C-alpha cells in the first residue's frame, strides 16, 4: 500500500475546504494506505480545543468525527506547522503551545521536508 502526505491550508473559515483533506485521508486509510496530515496556514486553527466540533460542511461528515477516526481509531499523525501556528498566536516564540490542541503535534519545516522525501504521494489542499 502507499504512503501519503496530505497538506491542508484552510481553516474553519471555509468548512468545505477544511474538511475535504480529512475526508480524503479517511478514504485512503480505509483502503489500507498510510496517511500523515500537515496543517499549514489557517488549517492550524482546526486543532485547538472546541474548534473541530463546530466545523460542519454541508453534506460532509463533521470535522471532529473525521479527526477522531484518524487519530484515535487508526493513529494517523497530524502535524501542526510551527511557524504558521506561531504567526497566528497559537504558539509562543519559544515554541510552547498557547492553547490546548486536541490533536496533532508541532512540526518544523525540516520535518516536512523529510516527510516529502519519504512519502510516495503528496496531496495539497
Language-model features, listed with the residues they occupy:
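Short internal beta-strands
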Residues: 35-41, 77-84
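Short, glycine-rich nucleotide/cofactor-binding loops
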Residues: 6-19, 51, 57
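Extreme N-terminal starter segment of soluble prokaryotic enzymes
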Residues: 1-5
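Ligand-binding beta-strand-loop-alpha-helix segment within the catalytic cores
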Residues: 79-82, 88-103
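Short, hinge-like loop/turn segments at secondary-structure boundaries
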Residues: 53-57, 96-99
Amino acid at each position: 500500500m502507499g504512503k501519503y502526505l496530505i497538506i491542508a491550508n484552510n481553516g474553519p473559515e471555509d468548512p468545505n475546504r477544511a474538511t475535504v483533506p480529512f475526508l480524503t485521508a479517511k478514504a485512503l486509510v480505509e483502503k489500507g494506505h498510510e496517511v500523515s496530515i500537515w496543517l499549514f496556514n489557517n488549517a492550524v486553527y482546526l486543532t485547538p480545543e472546541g474548534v473541530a466540533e463546530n466545523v460542519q460542511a454541508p453534506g460532509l461528515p463533521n470535522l471532529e468525527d473525521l479527526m477522531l477516526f484518524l487519530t484515535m481509531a487508526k493513529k494517523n499523525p497530524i502535524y501542526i506547522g510551527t511557524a504558521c501556528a506561531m504567526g497566528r498566536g497559537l504558539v509562543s516564540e519559544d515554541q510552547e503551545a498557547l492553547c490546548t490542541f486536541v490533536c496533532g503535534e508541532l512540526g518544523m519545516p525540516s520535518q516536512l521536508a523529510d516527510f516529502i522525501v519519504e512519502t510516495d504521494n503528496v496531496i495539497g489542499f
